Amino acid sequence: MAARDTQTFSARWDTDVLDRLKQRSEAAGTNKSRLAERYVDEGTRMDEHPGIVFRGGPTGRRAALAGGPDIWELMFTLKGGKARGEEAITATAELLNLTDSQVRTAVRYYGTFPDEIDRRIILNTLDADEAEAAWQREQAALG
């Protein structure tokens, strides 16, 4: 993984906020600075892209539609379809039981962070391929 450029940022924080940050960082097994950076990063992304939230899981945190699927899942579906342009928006919305507006929200987020979403698609595709191969080995072993 490439090193990231960083800068020091000094700020005065409310004591209660820092106490909660300390509790959350201990529970998450990370330091306060990293957790605060994550909160600021995700918070600014949510401000810039209303309707986007972040969820944790076994493969890490990922962007998702509020009340909907992960952005990588939506984009995987949209890119995998035959429709293009506005038809792709409508087809994806119908397939995932979303509104056209929700699909556009995801597409706008993807437009800003394509590498992040494409990496997630690749990671999950590899995981699915590995799971399929494991299942096939199990079936072969069972005769």
Question: Where do the model's predicted regions map?
Answer:
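Short, Lys/Arg-enriched anionic-surface-contact patches
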Residues: 2-4, 52-72
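Short, basic interhelical loop/turn and adjoining N-cap
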Residues: 30-31, 93-105
